Amino acid sequence: MQKTYIWALVSLLASSLVDARSAVFDQTPLDIGGSDDSFDSIARIDPNNNDLLKSEMDKVIASSELLSLHRALVEIKSISDNEQAVGGFLMDYLYSKNFTVEKQYVDYDDPTGKPIRSNRRFNIYAYPGNSASPGIILTSHIDTVPPFIPYSLSHPESASFKRDDILISGRGTVDDKASVACQVIAAMDHLEKHPDIPIGLLFVVSEEVGGRGMSTFSNSRLNSGTYHTIIFGEPTERALVAGHKGMVSFTIRVHGKPAHSGYPWLGRSAVSEMLPILTEVDRLGDIPVSQGGLPSSEKYGRTTLNIGFMSGGVAANVVAEEAVANVAVRLAAGNPEDAKDIIFRAIRNAATKHRKDATVVISNGLERPKGDIEVIFGLEAYGVVDIDADVDGFNVTTVNYGTDVPHWKIYGDNVKRYLYGPGTIFVAHGKNEALTVGELEAGLEGYKTLVAKAAERERS
């Protein structure tokens, strides 16, 4: 890991003055990539000549500030709760570009919920010179889901080589290091042209595991409330997102009584009691509210539930003493508290229908259970999130996934929030996570447009 970090940093910063940490912004013109005359001959390369193809693809990446930064970020493993290496690299990179950079440590929670200070993860807040309270802020997350997948380049088999078709694969290439790289370069481009309008960069940890990074920033002095525009980065296929669904998560824990499987009536199977409960839970998004279901809306469609994890018992010849299931809910309407009430009633009704004397309780999961069946709601819960999408030239959509948008407490009136980024969510978190050079560079242009629109607001 250390070798990877050093190589990435040296390759990107060899020509930079690393000691210039918080001065007037560098006015040197940027080389951010795009079409280049030196690559006009690439179309004549035989795409089946692997060695030559790899060499030319590497040249394309190395010739572009955007593509080189993206590669360096992706090559550094940064699975949630272990973002220190990529954070250190990004801080040094921003220092070298004459940003002032602040490091904000983000606590962990121990099993009892007590916060623990650690230097393994931290947010990064950067701005030009002394402009610590800019009106425009670009933000993305630097953590990824597991497992780590190395950076690689490929090109589709075709009669000719096309620069835009180079496929960049690896964990984080889309979610969310594409947005991180684009936002950095877009900010540098803006400051080169408009040094009188400061812009901030916020890169947070732990977005993939509950949003603790953004919540920490939101509750700190750095959240000054002087901003008028916040641009969040996520893979949106370069569309502006007009909003996304809300989120509720919960765990069901059933306590049974163990016995020999040859005499099941001497025990009580936790697995057998869990099954009818999950059957009822699984249909809550498909039935109307009048029948005990969860709400839907015209904008976001129906509420969906995913039973993502289930375990129970110890062996086939033992009546199961315990069963556990974890469920994620994507709310299409209503508020989280009402949704929790609906979910709890459904679980209780299913449990008592299966066994009349079943006791169902809401629990924090830490204390000794007071019932046969515990319902443990996660700490993260929010309703639908409406977002601005009023900039011309973009497709507009809604998405079903969660983001850091609801974790940022907004202070002040008329603050615009945009959600945008290159790449598609349909490959994020998958083995095939990837995007093309053309998609990444088009994403940068979209960020430039959003920043320019925000700058107009500041002038007015």
Swiss-Prot record:
Residues that, per the record, bind Zn(2+) 2: 175
Signal sequence bounds: 1-22
Record has Signal as a keyword: yes
Record key words, sorted: Glycoprotein, Hydrolase, Metal-binding, Protease, Secreted, Signal, Zinc
Essential cofactor(s): Zn(2+)
Details of cofactor binding: Binds 2 Zn(2+) ions per subunit.
Entry binding sites for Zn(2+) 1: 175, 208
Main location as per UniProt: secreted
Residues annotated as catalytic: 207 (proton acceptor)
Entries under CDD domains matching the protein: M20_ArgE_DapE-like_fungal
Domain of life: Eukaryota
Any GO molecular function: peptidase activity
Positions of glycan attachment: 98, 395
GO biological-process terms attached to the record: proteolysis
Gene Ontology terms: cellular component: extracellular region
UniProt-annotated location(s): Secreted
Enzyme Commission code: 3.4.17.-
Family: Belongs to the peptidase M20A family.
Protein name: Probable carboxypeptidase ARB_01041
Species of origin: Arthroderma benhamiae (strain ATCC MYA-4681 / CBS 112371) (Trichophyton mentagrophytes)
